[in-house]
């Protein structure tokens, strides 16, 4: 399951860590997608909430992905569900306008 951790960005906020676990041990930076309570209704957002360790309903914003030093990551607060992992993959394809077939596209 993909981790949701606190990170120091513009302020301390939850993020989904996108860098795969095996690579993290060798990296000084990781790529993360910030989580915000300001949903814009975009296809590049993934809904998350209390079931993921958050205080309130929010979205993972794949339009605002950043790479940060590992030492800006804080504690783990939760994880994405299997369904949210699928939505995350779909949101990445849509956010970056990748030419890949989408499963269950609607």
Label for each model-derived stretch:
Residues 1-4, 62:
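Loop/turn positions that initiate beta-strands
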């Amino acid at each position: 399951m993909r981790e949701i951790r606190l990170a120091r960005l513009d302020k301390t906020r939850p993020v989904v860590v996108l860098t795969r676990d095996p690579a993290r041990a060798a990296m000084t930076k990781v790529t993360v997608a910030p989580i915000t309570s300001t949903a814009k209704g975009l296809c590049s957002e993934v809904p998350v909430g209390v079931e993921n360790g958050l205080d309130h309903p929010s979205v993972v914003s794949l339009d605002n992905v950043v790479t940060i030093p590992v030492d800006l990551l804080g504690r783990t607060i939760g994880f994405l569900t299997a369904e949210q992992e699928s939505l995350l993959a779909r949101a990445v394809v849509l956010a970056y306008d990748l030419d890949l077939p989408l499963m269950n596209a609607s």
